[in-house]
Amino acid sequence: MLSHLKEKYHLDKVSANYLRSNKSYIKLYRNKVVEIRFSEENIDSLDDFLPFADTLKEIILYKCNLSDLSNLKYFKQLRVLGFNRCSFSNIEIFKNFTNLPKLKELVLNGREITYLNIFSNSIESLSISETSIKTLIDINIPNLKSLSMTRNPIKAIDALFPKLRELYITAGNFDLYSLKYTPNLRDLYAYDCIKNQSFDGAAVCTKLKYLQLYGEPFTNFLPFVKLNSLEILDLQESEIESLEGLEQMHNLKVLELFGNPIQKINSIKPIQHLKQFGIERHKVSPYMRRQMKKNDIIFIYCWI
């Protein structure tokens, strides 16, 4: 069975545990196939993989042409499944996606994917970034902990994810008030924000601790003053010019401001409640560094 795969996909044995080509590989454990990662292959069906259905834990396909996924239901030992920028001759499988009882991580990336109807009690991590999916309404994954849905048309959370802790979104025009459907959200990563966008809606997440807005168009802290539970804010490579509003964020403990146009930190007052502050060293005077030390603020700096 394995010899057929070696011949068809031009795989060479490079060690006791790996068969590899220039773009793809198969991993073995105790002479059993446990992982398949194929790139830019033409895969007529999953029939070639069926002899290993009882041992396969991970299948990742990248830029592959896929014709028939009907046998996916037989891979009941899978923990990780990924279709990254693949081409599908038939996308009907996404209208009633196979329930794989041990699957923990599902990655579906590609503009051809327009819809997803799935029920799973096992999946904990889902990525549907860079798809054409517009709604989450038919995604029923009650134990989901991490969701990535950047660069797609989704503008709101319209399904309940009671255990979700980590979320990646394209924030421009996203309805942040819809985060009420993620009551246990802890970490939010937001990309492609619009200028002067308010994050008031995210205040519905009363357990939100971490917010990353790397390289976004914010000039001060007023958009975040209602995030009372926030403890860590990462605004690196953004457009922060002043600390206005920061003094209102009483529970904030860690702030990262590397790569922002703000010139100098002239007062201890806006940052005195922080435990850790990251910024270029030349923007903090020796006097301010002494004040930070007096307030037990850990100064994380770079020399640039």
Predicted regions and their residues:
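LRR N-terminal entry segment and analogous cap-like coil->beta motifs
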Residues: 5-85
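Plant-biased, solvent-exposed loop and capping regions
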Residues: 1-8, 13, 50-52, 95, ...
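Concave beta-strand-loop units of leucine-rich repeat
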Residues: 36-43, 60-66, 77-90, 102-114, ...
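Positively charged, hydrophobic/aromatic-enriched amphipathic segments
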Residues: 1-20, 117, 137, 158, ...
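Hydrophobic anchor residues at the C-terminal helix/turn of individual leucine-rich repeat
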Residues: 49-51, 72-74, 94-97, 116-120, ...
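Periodic aromatic/glycine/histidine/acidic cluster detector
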Residues: 26, 199-200
